[in-house]
């Protein structure tokens, strides 16, 4: 039935887009206030956002209900919005203004390449009937990225000159 396909794709798009917008507003506001009290506030805020994507990936992988899928979309959108709102501000804590465009370009390019790789991988998992397990495995990768972020990102200033 075509109407269920349209409704489900529209619902997922709206869910993730709206929740990402909420995440951007929440993440930006929290980060701007937190960094005034703790120089790692932006890093911690980004980590909270990244952390929210972990249960969303697990829900996508193992959830079998409408509520689980919508909940996963909400968590992913809010988490990704919080994380994404803080990428450039965190970059500014480490990279001089002379090199920010280059650094941000490299960061974006890396994200595009990772997205292409993951899309291909998700396609293979889908073909093999293992998409749910694949999403759960992505949660492990995100957890490792979160640990790396928290361990290595130790800014000395809010704005590297």
Regions found by a protein language model. Give the residues of each.
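Intracellular juxtamembrane helix-capping segments at the cytosolic ends
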Residues: 82-95
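A late C-terminal transmembrane helix in Major Facilitator Superfamily
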Residues: 24, 92-128
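Hydrophobic core of transmembrane alpha-helices in multi-pass small-molecule transporters
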Residues: 66-82
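Short, small-residue-biased leader/transition segments that mark boundaries at the very start
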Residues: 1-8
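Cytoplasmic membrane-interface "Motif A"-like loop-to-helix N-cap segments
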Residues: 32-49
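Multi-pass alpha-helical transporter architecture, strongest
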Residues: 56, 60-62, 137-161
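A membrane-interface helix-boundary motif in multi-pass transporters
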Residues: 41-44, 121-141
């Amino acid at each position: 039935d075509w109407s269920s396909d349209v409704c489900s794709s529209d619902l997922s798009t709206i869910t993730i887009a709206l929740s990402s917008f909420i995440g951007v507003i929440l993440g930006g506001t929290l980060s701007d206030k937190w960094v005034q009290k703790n120089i790692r506030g932006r890093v911690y805020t980004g980590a909270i956002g990244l952390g929210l994507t972990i249960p969303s990936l697990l829900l996508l992988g193992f959830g079998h209900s409408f509520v689980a899928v919508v909940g996963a979309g909400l968590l992913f959108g809010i988490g990704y919005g919080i994380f994404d709102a803080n990428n450039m501000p965190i970059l500014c804590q480490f990279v001089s203004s002379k090199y920010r465009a280059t650094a941000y370009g490299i960061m974006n390019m890396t994200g595009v390449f990772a997205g292409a790789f993951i899309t291909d991988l998700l396609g293979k998992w889908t073909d093999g009937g293992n998409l749910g397990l694949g999403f759960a495995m992505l949660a492990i990768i995100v957890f490792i990225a979160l640990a790396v972020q928290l361990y290595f990102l130790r800014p000395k200033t809010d704005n590297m000159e």
